[in-house]
């Protein structure tokens, strides 16, 4: 009986967090253009490198002025110094990990990538997805990707308490919740030989205090934020 009540309490808490976070993030905001960073980088005579990115608005990048400013485009530009990079993005704004499994995984496999970048977790955190469900679906996704010859890199989940649109106590709740989801990224990656971007190693105080890293909607990052994300990704690559 006690266990059942505790389970209900945890579920209700997740729903409440999801509802409050969704309201904070989805209430009327400036509508920002989104982008598809797919394209080619570098000279055609160089050895080819096929890069696939699955994800959410961290890839479609509302808040930047052009595709060149998106973190994955910046990474591909650096890779193109020695490779002919073919980037294909399957990312859709608002996606949760279940959406990646159900809608983005199949076309990714058909692309036969050499490198796969998986940027997911923020929407699961915000919308009250349970940690157990997130882990199950992320493992389902990574298990399939790891069964290919591709190098798989997960985004992890940064400190979402830094988002300017969030205020205490929701800010603190999102910070703790996002840390748990980040740990899931690391656990799943370790099981399948994947890697995780260390966004949390990037100075958190700067993300809390520098509004220049955020776009006008105070939720998505700006071009300056994408530049920092690209630096984090490049250190892993």
Segments predicted by a language model, with ranges:
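N-terminal secretory targeting modules
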Residues: 1-52, 81
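Conserved SGNH/GDSL esterase-like catalytic core that processes O-acyl groups on lipids
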Residues: 48-52, 58-136
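A generic structural signal for well-ordered alpha-helical segments
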Residues: 80, 145, 188-190
């Amino acid at each position: 009986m006690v266990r059942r009540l505790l389970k209900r309490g945890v579920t209700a808490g997740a729903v409440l967090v999801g509802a409050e976070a969704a309201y904070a993030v989805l209430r009327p905001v400036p509508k920002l253009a989104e982008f598809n960073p797919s394209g080619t980088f570098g000279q055609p005579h160089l050895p080819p490198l096929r890069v696939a990115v699955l994800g959410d608005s961290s890839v479609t990048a509302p808040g930047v002025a052009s595709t060149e400013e998106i973190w994955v485009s910046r990474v591909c530009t650096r890779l193109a110094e020695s490779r002919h990079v073919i980037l294909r993005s399957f990312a859709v704004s608002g996606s949760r990990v279940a959406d990646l499994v159900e809608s983005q995984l199949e076309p990714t496999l058909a692309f036969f990538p050499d490198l796969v970048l998986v940027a997911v977790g923020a929407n699961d955190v915000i919308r009250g997805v349970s940690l157990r469900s997130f882990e199950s679906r992320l493992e389902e996704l990574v298990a399939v990707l790891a069964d290919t010859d591709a190098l798989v890199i997960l985004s992890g989940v940064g400190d979402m308490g830094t988002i300017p649109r969030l205020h205490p106590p929701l800010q603190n709740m999102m910070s703790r919740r996002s840390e748990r989801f980040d740990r899931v990224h690391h656990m799943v990656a370790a099981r399948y030989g994947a890697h995780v971007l260390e966004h949390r190693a990037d100075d958190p105080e700067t993300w809390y205090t520098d509004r220049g890293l955020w776009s006008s909607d105070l939720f998505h990052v700006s071009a300056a934020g994408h530049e920092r994300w690209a630096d984090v990704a490049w250190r892993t690559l």
